[in-house]
Amino acid sequence: MGRLLVLLLLGAVTMTMAQTIPTMETGGRTMPDEWIDKDTGHRVIKLTRRGGSNVSFYFHNNPFVADEMVFRGSDVEHAGNDMMHGAGPKRRTQMYAVNLKTLDIRQLTNEPYNVSTEIVCPATHEIFYQHEDSVFALNIDNLRKRTIAVMPKELRGGIVTVNADGTLLAGKLDDPEERKILGEHPKKSEFFRLIFDARLKKTIFTINTRTGIMDTIYSERAWLNHLQFSPTDPTLLMFCHEGPWHEVDRIWTMDVVKREKPRLIHKRTMYREIAGHEWWGADGRHIYFDLQKPRGETFFVGKTNVYSGVEEDFELQRSEWSVHFVSAWDEKTLAGDGGSKTSVAHSPEGQWIYFFEYDGPRLKATRLVNMKNHDYKLEPNVHYSPDQHWIIFRANFEGVENVYAVEINTGCFSPNRF
């Protein structure tokens, strides 16, 4: 009898909480801090409850340290294309952190210049950022800042990733010819082909975060991009051959200590096949990627074991294709951010935040958030919350950029959100 009473009380509390959360269309107006998407039945909450514009990280960059998520915030509202480095009105951008248990927000950086970084090391509780030729680390617990290195004039470049134990940063050297092309042809539709065809010499470098020593480790006459250190192996770096995806074997890895010949992760097998938007699985054993065979016709998520080379491909519907996919921390499920009608899949029904489960050689999709009021010029870039109960994404469906989380399972209504 006592156990039944407890169950009834819990049920009553759950129903009461559910009734206090409004069910409504997502976006197209100012939203409350919490609501239930009327088209999916899933609960959505706003994580960045501050003024200005707030943007979470690119899909493969880990923003989580302990109970906090690092994000970029500015004092200017702008609902346009922010992507990775910011655009639109002049703004003062700094780094912030939101506590995923309390939703309290604190400012991490307060520089006289804009700070827009996505380099976070959970192992050392540091964020790394750069201003002109100087590279800094900031401990997010005590906010102590240290200078790591000042780049020599002959070796200027940009840092983009940190290794698993926080001892190495990696980036690419600047190229004057590439800067010239970008200056003369600022539209991606113009510069993308021009830089690819130029076959400029590109160089990857590392910086030791303890000694500040900068070392060039690999050069090639190819457009090297999207550097990502393994989340578990401090010496293993992934990079891509940028360019039109159907013309490049894109995804490569190399050991930054042994400096052996880079290893190709996926080789194209047919005309107009593409593989890209690659990311590391959390265990560091697999690299995942968007795979289309051929482009715009048949859609998969590919998964390659970096040690054995064994690849598995999982098919999904055209309408379920996403600009970016991401794997859960336990790698048992996937999520995706959907796409607009003008995206690669050209699906009129693709504007959703998706949750995917494996079903043999296919992926079974669940729609979590209707994104019809979101402008996909700002890519949502999904992340799993550390407890894997929520999918975190960025959106402009209120008319300003903010960061949100949608609950994967319906009907929980737990007061302990994360």
Regions found by a protein language model. Give the residues of each.
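Short, conserved, GDST-rich strand-edge loop motifs in beta-rich repeat architectures
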Residues: 20-27, 73-90, 171-199, 240-248, ...
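Beta-strand-rich domains and repeat architectures in extracellular enzymes and scaffolds
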Residues: 21-34, 39, 43-93, 227
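Multi-bladed beta-propeller domains
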Residues: 35-55, 98-114, 140-155, 206-223, ...
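Blade-loop segments of beta-propeller domains
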Residues: 53, 57-60, 76-132
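Hydrophobic beta-strand positions that form the internal "hydrophobic ladder"
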Residues: 69-71, 126-127, 168-169, 236-237, ...
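Asp-box/WD-like beta-propeller blade repeats and closely related beta-sheet repeat scaffolds
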Residues: 110-202, 216-219
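Loop/turn-rich, solvent-exposed surfaces of beta-rich toroidal or solenoidal domains
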Residues: 281, 285-302, 310-364
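Blade-level signature of beta-propeller repeat domains, shared across WD40, Kelch, NHL, RCC1
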Residues: 379-418
